[in-house]
Structure formats: C-alpha cells, structure tokens
Amino acid sequence: ELLEEGEDCYCHIPPNPCCDPATCKLTPGSQCAEGLCCDQCRFKKKGTICRIARGDFPDDRCTGLSDDCPRWNDL
C-alpha cells in the first residue's frame, strides 16, 4: 500500500480505527495505524521482536519510535 501525498495512513477499505477515513490522518492519540511495530494504534515497546531470526541472524526488534520493523543490520 502506498500512501498518497498528505496521507498519514491508508484510510480505505477495510476501516482502520487508528486512521480517520475522511482525512487519511491518524486519529487523535494514535502513533501509527499499521506495521509490524504497531499495536492498537501505538508503537510497540523498544526491543519487542517483530521478525523471528533466520539462520545466524538475530531477531529483528522494534525501536519504540516507529511502526517499521528494521532489519537487524539497519540498526
């Protein structure tokens, strides 16, 4: 899903309680609307596993500052 210019979140079908369907902006108090590090409109805590490790690589973990799940080597 690609956001259009001026949108904070994808506000189309299905409805998302974190995203205002009229403005495509986050609802008051929401930090995020979706993503591996978003839970109930809030960023998951720093260190929360968002992607299980494969092979010799460590688990990917949330930063607590974003809804994205960075790859271990992006930190």
Swiss-Prot record:
Residues 1-75 form the Disintegrin domain. Belongs to the venom metalloproteinase (M12B) family. P-II subfamily. P-IIa sub-subfamily. Keywords: Cell adhesion impairing toxin, Disulfide bond, Hemostasis impairing toxin, Platelet aggregation inhibiting toxin, Secreted, Toxin. The disintegrin belongs to the medium disintegrin subfamily. Disulfide bonds join C9-C24, C11-C19, C18-C41, C32-C38, C37-C62, C50-C69. Inhibits fibrinogen interaction with platelet receptors, and inhibits aggregation induced by ADP, thrombin, collagen and platelet-activating factor. Acts by binding to the alpha-IIb/beta-3 (ITGA2B/ITGB3) on the platelet surface. One of its GO terms (molecular function) is toxin activity. A motif (Cell attachment site) lies at residues 54-56. It is found in: Secreted. Expressed by the venom gland. It comes from Protobothrops flavoviridis (Habu). Monomer (disintegrin). The keyword Iron does not apply. The keyword Secreted applies. One of its GO terms (cellular component) is extracellular region. This is Disintegrin CTF-II.
